Amino acid sequence: MQPTNSFKGIVMLLLCSFIWGTAFVAQSVGADLLGPFSFNGIRSFLGAFFLVPCIAVIDRLSGKPLSFWGTDDSHKRGDLITGGLCCGVLLTIASTLQQTGIAYTSAGKAGFITALYIVIIPILGLLVKKHVTFMQWAAVAVAAAGMYFICINEGFSINKGDLIVLACAVVFAVHIMAIESFTQLVDPVRMSAIQFFVCGMLSLPVIIWAEQPELSAITAAWLPLAHAGIMSCGIAYTLQIAGQKYVNVILASILLSLESVFSVLAGWMFLGETLSMREIGGCVLVFAAILLAQMPERK
């Protein structure tokens, strides 16, 4: 992999985690106004609808004929549909498990346990015979320790909410690995759009028959919905898919876990929240893990 392309992928994933981390306030406000399926479903549709004109603009600028699929090759179109469906289903399951589990545990514990996908990914990699270097294992361990210091401020015990969120972390790990499998085969913007159409459609039955949000609640939440739909879904997740094309999955997972670091830093910078030495130490460890993950393996 060319160093220039690797750097490009790192920048994309950093931007992705930055957007996710700084979007925490908007998502919290939206969650107070709408049920989890309503908020996630509507923002998914917004993300998909935002990406459709982006696809048209990109095609026009590159001189390609306007087409949602971007190809007449049935195999490439099949890869695109399969990738979008797989990633959309996985993302919906992970988001639902996270939202369910967080009702029974603290936000800090949920954040830490979710970030354990950085540990789960290399374990799953071994199952599919992917080579993981010693430095990558070290980076994963350091990043996990950093996430613990950032997210956990009280004693650690396990309850049913923690187990649900752990299941969410496993699904997120599979989601990241699925993106790695498809990102070399398909256009990232198109796959991202399909992913969010799938997320929205899977949420729709629950929105209609269970949560039944009032129009006044949706209009009251328009700003956090727009932010989460356009920034978190439309832009950030697309950056994730595009960035993973150039970065190995271990480094990608650590870069994506910076969401928690950026969330803490954003709270300190913009909301006047206190940043403890424990949290600062955790941030330093995660950044150190990023450097470790990029070190070459000794021959």
Task: Set out the residue ranges of the language-model regions.
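Glycine-/small-residue-enriched transmembrane alpha-helix faces in small-molecule transporters
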Residues: 1-42, 88-89, 93, 97, ...
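Hydrophobic/small/kink-forming positions within alpha-helical transmembrane segments
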Residues: 21, 25, 88, 92, ...
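Specific transmembrane alpha-helical segments of multi-pass solute transporters/efflux pumps
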Residues: 23-24, 55-114, 149, 229-247
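Specific alpha-helical transmembrane segments that line the substrate/conduction pathway
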Residues: 38-49, 99-130, 168, 249-268
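Hydrophobic transmembrane alpha-helices of multi-pass small-molecule transport proteins
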Residues: 51, 132-152, 172, 203, ...
